[in-house]
A protein has these predicted regions:
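A conserved structural/catalytic subdomain of Rossmann-like adenosyl-cofactor enzymes
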Residues: 2-38, 42, 213-216
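Extended accessory and catalytic-adjacent subdomains in large enzymes
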Residues: 16, 122-124, 225
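Non-catalytic DNA-recognition/assembly elements of restriction-modification systems
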Residues: 20-23, 27-28, 38-87, 100, ...
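Polyanion-binding catalytic cores of nucleic-acid enzymes and NTP/SAM-utilizing transferases
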Residues: 28-181
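Conserved structured core elements
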Residues: 62, 139, 164-168, 182, ...
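Short, ligand-facing micro-motifs at secondary-structure edges
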Residues: 113-117, 149-167, 186, 190, ...
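C-terminal substrate/ligand-recognition segments
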Residues: 138-150, 171-198, 221, 225-239
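Glycine-anchored helix-breaking recognition loops at helix->coil/strand junctions
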Residues: 159, 170-171, 196-222, 255, ...
């Protein structure tokens, strides 16, 4: 029924599985959702895999923006479809009249440019699908979009073709009939290369991080349409062409190549920042994007490694599973979330809310206390208690579900004058995005305890 509550458990890559063939589920990977939510928001199941209810709220807000699909649905201005199909068994359509036209290889399409070395002359005489009723998609100008995402950044690769050309169905074409509407295609191409695009791919694209890094047509079109303030596309297209030209020079200098790459990176940062400003992003939403890019994305890349030895190495060297060093900014940022939230309630009547960080190389604990104003020195105090915390390792155990499945437990609780949390020393567990979830859980517990006392 619609009111049925579903428990969703997400299994992620971990050192335990790679080294011991044991599945370990973290606390935040177990979530509950009412069934009617999954019916109403068909992308929510993907949020349950890589996100939380905070991501759901953020994405729901993004869905309220005008979509790219709604912009190009005006058939007088745009037409969109995928290209032709090569098929030996059902090649029934005569296309000899297309012979010697430009044929754009799918791999020619990269962010902001089409590699001219991967454009050749069309030589096929018959096809399995020739798009007879939609041949305008081959007439310039058109935005060509690859279904396969960039595996490094999980962004969508797209570029505008100013030349009429043939291409396969692995490319989606959005053709603008009026040249002035090319600006719309440029805006979309810029969005496709952004951090927000990567975030949406991880949190809403059904195949990404699950099966393979591919996007379906409806996913590529159901993204926010944002009008940028300047023509970033032309600048980046020019930079990429300069980069390709420079690389072809037999005696090119690596310094020149690096300079162009640096300029491309700077321009992309400008796009990212303007996009975030256009959606009026807040601090929590920025941290959710950061978590997706710096925790979930490396996890997805790691999962795509097929060679077993390379996977072991990827796990061993991965940032997300690496330990936090004493004094690392990660811990201070995590603790600051608690201070920003609870200090409003506790910093009164000559009292101050502080966080004591107890550090060891295996586990980390935080004690959240309210002290007298005259004892206050600073909000976050770090204590190196490497030897004292070792005894707590046994308490930071796992809940045995089956011989191959365990749930990794945190230690969290309340005492008379403070509350506390202990977790393993892994960077992914102490990210700011996780801090918001932990803070809300503590806040709910405090409110519940207060109601019970009434």
């Amino acid at each position: 029924t619609d009111t049925n509550v579903i428990t969703h458990i997400s299994i992620k890559p971990s050192k335990f599985f790679s080294f011991f063939k044991v599945l370990v589920v973290c606390r935040n990977d177990i979530q509950q959702v009412q069934q009617n939510r999954l019916k109403k928001f068909d992308w929510l199941w993907k949020v349950l895999v890589y996100g939380s209810y905070l991501d759901f709220i953020f994405i729901k807000r993004l869905k309220e923006f005008t979509s790219f699909k709604s912009v190009i649905n005006n058939r007088k201005k745009f037409v969109h479809a995928t290209g032709v199909t090569f098929s030996k068994n059902s090649a029934i359509y005569d296309v000899t009249h297309w012979k010697d036209r430009d044929f754009i290889n799918t791999r020619a399409v990269e962010c902001f440019h089409i590699d001219p070395d991967k454009v050749e002359k069309f030589q096929m005489e018959r096809l399995g699908r020739n798009r007879t009723s939609m041949q305008d998609i081959f007439i310039a100008p058109m935005l060509l979009i690859r279904h396969g995402l960039d595996l490094e950044k999980l962004i969508v690769r797209s570029a505008i073709s100013y030349k009429t050309a043939i291409f396969k169905k692995s490319l989606l074409s959005v053709k603008a009939y009026d040249f002035k509407d090319v600006d719309i295609l440029k805006n979309i191409s810029c969005f496709y290369s952004s951090n927000l695009m990567s975030y949406l791919a991880i949190l809403t694209f059904s195949s990404v991080g699950i099966e393979r890094e591919n996007a379906k047509e409806f996913e590529l079109l159901n993204i926010p349409y944002l009008r940028l303030s300047q023509d970033y596309y032309n600048k980046l297209e020019s930079m990429h062409h300069s980069f390709l030209k420079k690389k072809k020079e037999p005696l090119h200098k690596e310094h020149d190549i690096a300079t162009i790459q640096s300029e491309i990176s700077k321009e992309c940062k400008k796009i990212n920042e303007e996009i975030l400003q256009l959606i009026n992003i807040d601090t929590i939403e920025r941290d959710l994007i950061d978590y997706a890019l710096n925790i979930s994305l490396p996890m997805i890349r790691m999962n795509s490694v097929n060679n077993i030895m390379r996977k072991y190495k990827a796990l061993r060297d991965s940032y997300i599973f690496s330990k936090i060093e004493l004094g690392d900014q990660v811990l201070e940022e995590y603790a600051q979330v608690y201070i920003d939230y609870f200090a409003r309630s506790f910093n009164r009547n000559e009292k101050r809310f502080i966080v004591e960080v107890h550090y060891s190389s295996q586990i980390i604990g935080m004690f959240f206390k309210v002290i007298d104003q005259d004892l206050f020195s600073k909000e976050i105090i770090t204590v190196d208690t490497n030897t004292n915390l070792i005894t707590l390792v046994t308490k930071l155990s796992t809940q045995h579900i089956t011989d191959q499945l365990f749930v990794q437990k945190d230690i969290r609780g309340f005492e008379k004058d403070f509350f506390y949390i202990f977790k393993p020393n892994e960077k992914r567990l102490w990210h700011k995005a996780i801090a918001y979830l932990d803070v809300n859980e503590f806040d709910d517990a405090i409110l519940k305890a207060g109601r019970n006392e009434i």
